[in-house]
């Protein structure tokens, strides 16, 4: 909305709010004000009939003319109306008439009381005050925006500007002020004629403008609007108006300094002819300022110069800088150089021709002044030196650094013909001439190395050349190949084919005739098989085969074989079946033997008996005692139960007992006695020796029954029995060797392998009966496949039956030791036995080492018991039976000594 409309609306609202309702001539305004914003307790004095009409009518009245006519017509119209209504809207603007709309509505409500009317009056006054303050603020903001928008710094236009220098003004300063004509409204033809016609008059102090209001405001006439204040503000300044592309519409004439009131005139405009562009060169310097007396002397104004080049106006004055251009413009062509005669003349140089395209001004900012023209040396002082041209010679930089004498000497000594070797990274030390060093004693010719040898061993040039050549060749090969397969797939396939050294013709012949192929090659071809899309692209490829990569060439040569990958699967099955079937059969045989060994081992049963009796003895009197069997997992817990000495475990005790019993049994079996009699123990023989010694001690007549030599013989015999028993117990691991092998098998893996063989055989049979029969070919592959299927059916069927039988056998073996638990534990029984055999072997080694230590200590023992006790304390394990034998030997020696003493007394 225009600022004038804001002012008119504010004036009308203030008139409605502030006009007294009893003022003569403005009674209608007061009445409208009272009925619009607040109601009174009594009817209006001047409009008594407005509040008693019940029917609703709407009448619009237009009041024309001046104020008297408006009041007269409004008064007559109100008195003439039949009813009364409420004035709802009043509008006024410029030349548009004031429109008053009187609405009549039904009057069915009763009259309000005086107390309600007073409350409404207070509310209405408050609302009116708030509205008045709001309107005043809006008007203030609108006026402020109007002033800020009229500032010369905010009026921006991207069009070129035309500058006029005011040479005859009192000041040399210039101010670039842009005037936007659209902000003031369109100029009428009258104003344009007045502006153009007033150029020659020169005696007008004021200029009248007839502004045409825009369509939205109404028909307004603004006659006799004085621009004297604006002209006074713009006096002695340079005024820049907006011009079109190569055409000037309006110009502002210069202002006379002697006039009392500055007048605004315009100079005649016209078409500016475009001069041909001069040759390219550096941007021209700014023209020099003219002396103040130049125009007064000659009596005419100088012609306007062309627009200054970019940057020329920066130092011309202190006025507002022009806005930056929207797009960068080319610099203006240079003016022709003035002649020497013109340089010394009093008049300024002729203006240069204007450029073909107006040059845009530079963005605001200080900059160095341009250099003076060639002819301005005699008229004024010189300016700063011109800046360096973009294409001119650059300034010389600092001189390059000089090399150190050592580096220069090393570079001079370097022979370009020598081969380049690998670098040897070391720390160089600079020799100090003032200090004696070891390096001073090294002579130059004391050592000579073989140059050829060092070049052959540590040469770097040949390897780099080879690597670069290889990279170039590989790059050339990679660029000329057509890739169809996936890059990773093609790379892996090419590597496998190169490693196996197999051609596509060999693979094609093997697939068609049924020849043997390496299983690795078949697995590679099946694994990196192309997708359906890649296979279709290989079949439809019509280019040169040499343009394909190695993998693509190989696959394209064999891809047209019917049922290629079904044939490869059949060949792989035919190659893998014998080996896989043999491995499965070997595993089944091992499992069967392991079950038989575990169930028929006498020594293993003896071990279980010893553990059962020992456990019942230790658990006697508790709920754990009286057991008749135990799970084989208990064997792994024997090594965890230790004796009071902290060294002997329960497993050690059980092994010692089994060694003793098995030693006597082995000795009697070797001597041929004890066929059906019960095996006597070592302890019974020891007791017999002890009884014999006691009887010899008690009877004086039989003092010579047992001597020391016989006791030593018995001890040696006992040690021999122990060694025999230790060998029998240690051989348990060898007797259950197949059990250890069976523990490494996986029952589920064996079952899956056998099932896979059967499934692949069924698949090969289906391919033979459907796919190959549809081809109706009599090839070597078909004949071999038929023979293979017929022979393999019996073998695979037998493997399936063996798998079922061995599963039942393993289940029966587990039940034989653990009972019918109803849980399928697989081959876990063999795993437990294997782990126990490992612990048993460790204990047998410890017992053997202890026996060797005891034999060595027996040889080195002294007559006194102290060394024996000390030796026994040093041992890691002490056999209780050895202690019994030592006590018996001591008793026999005491008996012999007492017998000899009694004989001497006699």
UniProtKB/Swiss-Prot annotation:
Domain FH2: 411-866
Top-level lineage group: Eukaryota
Signal sequence interval, chain numbering: 1-25
Bias kind Pro residues: ranges: 274-292, 320-339, 348-375, 383-402
One Gene Ontology term from the biological process aspect of the record: actin nucleation
GO molecular function, one term: actin filament binding
Protein name: Formin-like protein 18
Organism: Oryza sativa subsp. japonica (Rice)
Gene name of this polypeptide: FH18
């Amino acid at each position: 909305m225009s600022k004038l409309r804001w002012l008119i609306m504010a004036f009308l609202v203030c008139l409605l709010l502030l006009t007294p309702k009893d003022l003569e001539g403005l009674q209608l305004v007061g009445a409208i004000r009272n009925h619009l914003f607040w109601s009174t307790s009594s009817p209006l004095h001047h409009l008594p009939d407005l509040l008693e009409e019940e029917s609703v009518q709407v009448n619009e009245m237009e009041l024309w003319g001046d104020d008297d006519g408006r009041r007269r017509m409004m008064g007559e119209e109100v008195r003439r109306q039949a009813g009364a209504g409420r004035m709802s809207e009043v509008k006024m603007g410029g030349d548009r008439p004031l429109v008053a709309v009187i609405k009549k509505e039904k009057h069915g409500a009763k009259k309000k009381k005086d107390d309600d009317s007073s409350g409404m009056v207070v509310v209405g006054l408050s609302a009116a005050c708030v509205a008045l303050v709001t309107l005043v603020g809006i008007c203030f903001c609108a006026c402020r925006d109007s002033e800020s928008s009229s500032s010369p710094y905010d009026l921006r236009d991207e069009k070129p500007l035309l500058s006029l220098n005011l040479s005859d003004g009192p000041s040399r300063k210039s101010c670039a002020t842009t005037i936007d004509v659209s902000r003031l409204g369109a100029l009428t033809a009258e104003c344009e004629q007045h502006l153009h016609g007033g150029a020659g008059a020169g005696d007008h102090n004021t200029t009248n403008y007839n502004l045409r209001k825009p369509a939205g405001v109404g028909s307004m006439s603004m006659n006799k609007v004085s621009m004297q204040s604006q002209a006074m503000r713009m006096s002695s300044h340079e005024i820049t108006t907006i011009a079109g592309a190569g055409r000037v519409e309006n110009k502002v004439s210069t202002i006379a300094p002697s006039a009392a009131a500055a007048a605004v005139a315009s100079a005649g405009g016209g078409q500016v002819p475009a001069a041909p562009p001069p040759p390219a060169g550096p941007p021209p310097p700014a023209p020099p300022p003219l002396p103040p007396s130049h125009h007064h002397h000659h009596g005419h104004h100088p012609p306007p110069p062309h627009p200054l080049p970019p940057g020329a106006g920066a130092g011309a004055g202190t006025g507002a800088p022009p806005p930056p251009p929207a797009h960068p413009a080319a610099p203006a062509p240079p003016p022709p150089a003035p002649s020497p005669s013109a340089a010394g003349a009093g008049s300024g140089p002729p203006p240069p021709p204007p450029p073909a395209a107006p040059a845009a001004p530079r963005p605001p900012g200080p900059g160095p002044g341009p250099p003076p023209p060639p002819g301005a040396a005699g008229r004024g002082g010189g300016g700063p030196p011109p800046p360096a041209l973009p294409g001119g010679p650059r300034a010389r930089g600092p001189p390059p650094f000089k090399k150190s004498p050592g580096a220069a000497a090393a570079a001079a000594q370097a022979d370009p013909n020598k081969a380049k070797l690998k670098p040897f990274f070391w720390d160089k030390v600079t020799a100090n001439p003032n200090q004696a060093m070891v390096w001073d004693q090294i002579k130059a010719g004391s050592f000579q190395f073989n140059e050829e040898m060092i070049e052959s061993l540590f040469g770097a040039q040949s390897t780099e050349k080879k690597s670069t050549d290889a990279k170039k060749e590989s790059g050339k090969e990679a660029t000329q190949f057509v890739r169809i397969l996936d890059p990773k797939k093609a790379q892996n396939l090419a590597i496998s084919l190169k490693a196996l050294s197999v051609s596509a013709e060999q693979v094609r012949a093997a697939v068609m005739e049924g020849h043997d192929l390496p299983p690795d090659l078949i697995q590679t071809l099946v694994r990196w098989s192309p997708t359906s899309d890649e296979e279709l692209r290989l079949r439809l490829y019509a280019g040169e085969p040499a343009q394909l990569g190695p993998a693509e060439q190989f696959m394209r040569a064999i891809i047209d074989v019917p049922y290629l990958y079904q044939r490869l699967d059949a060949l792989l099955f035919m190659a893998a079946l014998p080996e896989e079937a043999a491995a499965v059969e070997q595993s089944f045989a091992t499992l069967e033997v392991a079950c038989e060994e575990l169930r028929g081992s006498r020594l293993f049963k003896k071990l279980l008996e010893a553990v059962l009796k020992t456990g019942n003895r230790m658990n006697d009197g508790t709920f754990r005692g009286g057991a008749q069997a135990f799970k084989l997992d208990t064997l792994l817990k024997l090594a965890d139960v230790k004796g009071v000495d902290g060294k002997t475990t329960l497993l050690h005790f059980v092994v010692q007992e089994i060694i003793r019993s098995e030693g006597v049994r082995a000795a009697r079996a070797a001597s041929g006695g004890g066929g059906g009699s019960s095996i006597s123990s070592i302890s019974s023989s020891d007791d017999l020796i002890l009884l014999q010694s006691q009887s010899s001690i008690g009877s004086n007549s039989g003092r010579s029954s047992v001597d020391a030599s016989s006791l030593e013989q018995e001890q040696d015999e006992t040690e021999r029995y122990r060694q025999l028993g230790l060998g029998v117990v240690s051989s348990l691991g060898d007797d259950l060797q197949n059990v250890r092998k069976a523990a490494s098998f996986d029952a589920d893996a064996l079952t899956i392998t056998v099932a896979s063989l059967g499934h692949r055989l069924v698949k090969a049979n289906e391919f033979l009966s459907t796919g190959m029969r549809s081809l109706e070919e009599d090839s070597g592959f078909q004949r071999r496949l038929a023979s293979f299927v017929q022979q393999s059916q019996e073998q695979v069927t037998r493997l399936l039956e063996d798998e079922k039988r061995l599963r039942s056998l393993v289940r029966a073996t587990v039940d034989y030791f653990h009972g019918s638990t109803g849980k399928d534990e697989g081959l876990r029984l063999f795993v437990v036995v294997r782990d126990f055999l490992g612990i048993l072997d460790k204990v047998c080694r410890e017992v053997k080492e202890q026996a060797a230590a005891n034999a060595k200590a027996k040889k080195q023992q002294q007559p006194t018991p102290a060394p024996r006790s000390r030796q026994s304390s040093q041992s890691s394990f002490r056999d209780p039976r050895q202690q019994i034998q030592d006590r018996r030997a001591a008793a026999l020696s005491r008996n012999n000594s007492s017998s000899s003493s009694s004989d001497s007394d006699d």
